[in-house]
Design a protein with these regions (language model features):
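A short beta-sheet element
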Residues: 1-53
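A short glycine-rich beta-alpha junction/loop motif
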Residues: 9, 24-29, 64-87
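Positions in alpha-helical segments
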Residues: 28-31, 42-43, 77-78, 94, ...
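Low-complexity, flexible helical/coil segments
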Residues: 39-48, 66-72, 81, 115-120
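Residue-level detector of secondary-structure transition/capping positions
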Residues: 52, 65, 97-100
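Amphipathic alpha-helical coiled-coil/heptad-repeat segments
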Residues: 82-126
Length: 126
């Protein structure tokens, strides 16, 4: 649980995630890393799935065919960056989660308004 999983050959497509489901068995094409206790898992997920990080880590890609270019686990782990204090990671990740939940709620409301609009337009032109 909270492990990071990525596909070395598909990192360019953002194939990286945090396991939020519990004990699972992943395909052998995925590499799995355990997150250090000094890093908040949700923050690490946000960091690793960010397009800026993926762009920077792709500098380590190796291979001769575009479809087969891959970032090795060793190169992935060699990437160094500074992390904020754990408390700041928690605040940041929780704030982003609340924003995400708000967006989902507003999207659901918008869908309802669009359905209502469609119904009213159909009723007008019977």
């Amino acid at each position: 649980y909270n492990d990071i999983c990525y596909n070395p050959a598909n990192l360019k497509f953002g194939v990286i995630c945090r396991n939020t489901y519990g004990d699972l068995i992943f395909s052998p094409i995925y590499v799995t890393f355990e997150i250090s206790n000094s890093v908040y898992p949700a923050y690490m997920e946000l960091f690793l799935t960010n397009a800026n990080f993926i762009g920077r880590i792709r500098r380590y890609e190796q291979g001769t065919v575009y479809e087969r270019m891959a970032v090795s686990p060793e190169d992935f782990l060699s990437y160094e960056t500074r992390m904020p204090a754990y408390e700041e990671q928690v605040k940041f990740a929780d704030k982003i989660q609340r924003i995400h939940e708000k967006i989902e709620l507003e999207s659901a409301i918008l869908d309802k308004y669009q359905s209502q609009r469609k119904y009213l337009l159909n009723a007008m032109f019977i």
